Amino acid sequence: DRSETEEFEFIRCLCIYDYTEEELYSATKHFSSALDLYLRKFSFDGVNTKVSDSDITLRDILTQYFQEYKVQKITNRIHPSFENTINKFAIERPYNKLRPRSSIISQLDKEKAELFFFDALGVEYLSFIKAKCEEYGLIVEISIGHCELPSITEKNKEFIQYFGGKYRKIDELDELKHHSQIYDYEKIKEPIHIFRELEIIDEELRRIQSLLVQETITKAIIVSDHGA
C-alpha cells in the first residue's frame, strides 16, 4: 500500500507535468492497481447501452468522452476541445437518447434481489467496478441510462418504489465529494480524493460479495441517482 504522501506526490506529478497518454497509463499501472483499473477504457456497447439504430454512434461518442474525462480528472485539467464537447452536449443533450433509468429498473428481474442505492456513483467508475467484480468472482450485468432532472438526490430516487421502499443506502461517495473535512478543493487542487473514492466502491463490492457468499442475499442491484 502507498502512503497518503506518496499518493499526493504521484497525483501532483500527473498534474504539473505533460505526459503522453501512453506514459500516463504506464506510470499509473506501476503505481496503483486501483487507479489502473479506473483508467481502463469502458466500452459502451449494444449490450450495456440500448439506443435506437439511428443513434448507435452515441456509444462510441460516450466511450471516448468518459475516457477523456477520466484522464483529465486525475491530471486536474480540461482541454479546450473537451470543454467544447461539454458545451455541445449541454445544448444537444444526446444522453437523453439513452433509456430512462426508471424504464431499465422496471424491467429488471428483482425477485430475491437487494437494492444498493449508491449516491453519486457515476459511469466513470464502471471499468473499475467491472474489473473488481471479476476479481471477486461476481457475475456483473451493466445497464446504462439517464436520470431525470433535477438530478439532486431528494428529487431523483423514483427507482426505490420498484423495491417496495427497501434498500441499502451508501452515502460515503457523495459525502466525500460534497462535505469532506479532509479533501478540500479550495485548499488542495490536486484530485487526491480519487484513491478514497475507489476504496469506498471497493469496500462496498467486497461487502456485497460477503453477503452473497453467506446467502444473506441472492442478488445485488446497484443503482445510482447521479454522477459523472
Predicted features along the sequence, with ranges:
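…; additionally, a secondary subgroup of soluble metalloenzymes is captured
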Residues: 1-114, 120-220, 224-228
